[in-house]
Amino acid sequence: MSKENVVADSWDDADADPVKELMDKVEKVKLLQRKEEKKEAFFEKVKAEESSGVVSKLQTEEGLGPSAEEPKRVFLRRPKDGFAASENVIEASPPTSADTEEQPVTNVRSRSHHKLNQKEKQPAPTYEERQAAYQAARNRILGTEYKPDNQEIKEIKFIDRSKSPETLKMTQQNMVEHYGEELSRELMEQPAEIVPPERQYTPDFTQPPPSVSESGGVYNGPPGFQQKQPNFQPTLQQQSLHQQQYLDNQYMMQMNVQIPIQYHNQTQHQFVPHEASAISTTSQNSNGDGQNDQAIYYYQAPTQQPMNYIPYNLPNMAYPPPNFQPQGQLHHQMNAGQLHQIQQQQQQCQQIQHQPPQQHQQVINGQVMNQQNQRNQVNSYPQQNGAGRGQNRQPMMYQMPCNSGPTAKPPPLMNQMQNRCMTNNGQNYQNRNMQQQGQQRSYSSQPQNGQFYQNGNSNQNNPNNGRKQQHQPQQQQNKSGKFGQNRNDMQKNNYQPNLQQPPMSQNPIPFGCPPRNVNAIREQHANNGSPNTGAGILGPHPMMSASQWPALQQNRPQ
């Protein structure tokens, strides 16, 4: 056998001698054949011994002798013709001492065949016997006192089919008629697969939360709630209070209306200028001067698209709903006498405003501040006496007048929470007045940098609230002296404990106010002026990546 004709079995042993490997394989095959022959010879020998009944002598310790009785070894082998002859397999029965070989093969059958033969031999029980056996078993199980309810079983009628043999015509009445009430109720139920799965409200982490940019630290409630004064645009000249239209829904007011607010340069909202035709420029003020021709900017709330089924406009049910009345009812409760008294107080304020500076400084600590507060309380509603927009640029819920006298009572919907927030507003207006005190500008008809002068816009600091000043230089000196006096009043009144307030019976902030630490955090953000990237105090959401929140690369508030 030459090396060229032999093919190696594997790549590993290609270098080995192929002839030698082939010879090794031949040797292995011969060894296996020899083993098989020895095994067959052993089986033949055992069969011959069993047939002769000679017990082989085993070598014991004493030498060759008869050993103890060995158990008989039975080799169960598979029949050569497959399982066809398995019914006639002879079971090995324990050998008896007398006749081991004379056992008839016919008696040895499987147990199942034995039982079948026994059943065939017995006659079938009659109906009476079966009834008696049933009664005995029932008495044994249920007791002798058991009496069955002999109810008539309705025969189920055959259900008529429709033209298509696959669909059944089945109505509720048919079901009740055929199957009874309970079973038909179960049958008419929808299967569990058709039940729609519950919608999971997963928050949308792709957008940062809205930034808190107001310096007052006021809790702005859930996004669907009306937070600031709505913009009431009168279409006709309204002669009486009853012709005005109010929003009476105190729980949810839509944020689609445009809202006039004051704003700073740090806010990131959209401000839409409106032409003068949308606003009644000849609205009658209570003082008779219709100077309302400044261009007014309106805050348009950014429209929020509902993503992932987030209900933006639902009220927050973790807090009780507010129990205050809508604004329309508050105004309708005012009678004519109160309105007349309010107009008289406003005329008195106008007379005191034109006094020389010495008298003005003497009077302003007493009765004038109280009248100013009452005027502020009335004018905080933008609907009063026509749309007096020049006077009321502050939203009502966010402004707290200084309570300096014993007769000053807070306006409705105000409580201690507003007084605490007012300390920030007072400081901001003081700083603004200190910056612009030496400049002494007259108001121009156009806003500068898209922003109003904040100099006279607060009701606390100047009774000339938002109107143009076209008086003599003496009036401007009066204004500068009065600013210093008012600043001292602000410091005294804001840091005094306010003891004249009645116990709080109404909830001015719609869904409760935040705890003190949240207020402090928001005030700290507003005072630092750091850009609120939405990451919050604890950093971004742990499951967020920086690519989903690109604003996080800026300096984060500490």
Swiss-Prot record:
Give the region (Disordered) as residue ranges: 50-132, 205-241, 374-558
User: Where does it reside?
Assistant: Cytoplasm
Post-translation: what modifications? Phosphorylated. May be dephosphorylated by let-92.
Amino acid composition bias (Low complexity), ranges on this chain = 374-394, 424-477
What is a GO molecular function of this protein? RNA binding
Domain SUZ residues, every copy: 45-146
May I have one GO cellular component term? cytoplasm
Which UniProt keywords are present, listed alphabetically? Answer: Cell cycle, Cell division, Chromosome, Cytoplasm, Cytoskeleton, Nucleus, Phosphoprotein, RNA-binding
Q: Where is the composition biased (Polar residues)?
A: 94-109, 478-508, 545-558
- Alphabetically, which GO biological process terms does the record hold? cell division; embryo development ending in birth or egg hatching; meiotic chromosome segregation; negative regulation of protein localization to centrosome; positive regulation of fertilization; positive regulation of mitotic cell cycle, embryonic; positive regulation of mitotic cytokinetic process; regulation of centrosome duplication
The function of this protein is: RNA binding protein that is required for normal cell division and cytokinesis during embryonic development. Functions with RNA-binding protein atx-2 to ensure embryonic cell division, and to this end, plays a role in the regulation of centrosome assembly, position and size, and in astral microtubule outgrowth and nucleation. Furthermore, negatively regulates the levels of the protein kinase zyg-1 at the centrosome. Also involved in ensuring centrosome attachment to the nuclear envelope.
Listed under subunit, the entry gives: Interacts (via C-terminus) with atx-2 (via C-terminus); the interaction is RNA independent. Interacts with let-92.
* Entry text on domains: The C-terminal part is necessary for interaction with atx-2.
Q: What is this protein called?
A: Suppressor of zyg-1 protein 20
Organism of origin = Caenorhabditis elegans
Could you read off the lineage of the organism from its UniProt record?
Eukaryota, Metazoa, Ecdysozoa, Nematoda, Chromadorea
**Gene behind the chain:** szy-20
